[in-house]
C-alpha cells in the first residue's frame, strides 16, 4: 500500500465514505490512519463511524464548510504527479506560498480544492452522522472570491 496515496484518498472522501474506510481498514490502513489522525482521535472517530452505521433515517441535511486551515489544495501539472500544496506545513515553510498567488481572480498555477482535512474535521463529520444527520463535506478553494464559492455550493446543494 502506498501510504501517501491512501491518505490523499481519505482526505477526498465524503463523510459516509470516511466512516466506511475507518470501519473496513486493514492493518496497514489502520496504522496509516492512526499516524495521520493520532491514536486517540482515530479511536474516537472509529467509534463515531460505528454509531453512524447503526443509525437509520436522517434528521435532515448538514453541510460542513472548512476554514482556511481545513481545506486541501492540490497542484496539478501536466507532466507530474498531483501534489498537495495546502496544508502542508513543511512545504509552506520551504517557499510553498509562492505556489498560491492568484492573477485576475484565477490561480496562476493549476491548483484545485481536493478535500477537507479529516484530522481537523473528521470527528465533527462523524459525530453529526452518529446523531442521525445526513452529513456532507464541501471543500472549496479559499483563495477565490467567496461569492463564486457560494454559487458553486448552491448548485451542489440543488443536485
Where do the model's predicted regions map?
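N-terminal non-catalytic accessory region
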Residues: 1-159
Amino acid at each position: 500500500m502506498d501510504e501517501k496515496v491512501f491518505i490523499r484518498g481519505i482526505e477526498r472522501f465524503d463523510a459516509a465514505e470516511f466512516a466506511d474506510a475507518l470501519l473496513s481498514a486493514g492493518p496497514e490502513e489502520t496504522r496509516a490512519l492512526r499516524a495521520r489522525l493520532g491514536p486517540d482521535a482515530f479511536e474516537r472517530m472509529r467509534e463515531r463511524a460505528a454509531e453512524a452505521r447503526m443509525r437509520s433515517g436522517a434528521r435532515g441535511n448538514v453541510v460542513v464548510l472548512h476554514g482556511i486551515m481545513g481545506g486541501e489544495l492540490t497542484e496539478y501539472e501536466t507532466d507530474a504527479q498531483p501534489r498537495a500544496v495546502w496544508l502542508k506545513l513543511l512545504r509552506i515553510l520551504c517557499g510553498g506560498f509562492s505556489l498560491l498567488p492568484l492573477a485576475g481572480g484565477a490561480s496562476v498555477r493549476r491548483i484545485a480544492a481536493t478535500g477537507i482535512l479529516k484530522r481537523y474535521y473528521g470527528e465533527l463529520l462523524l459525530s453529526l452522522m452518529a446523531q442521525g444527520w445526513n452529513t456532507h463535506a464541501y471543500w472549496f478553494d479559499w483563495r477565490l472570491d467567496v461569492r463564486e464559492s457560494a454559487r458553486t455550493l448552491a448548485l451542489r446543494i440543488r443536485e
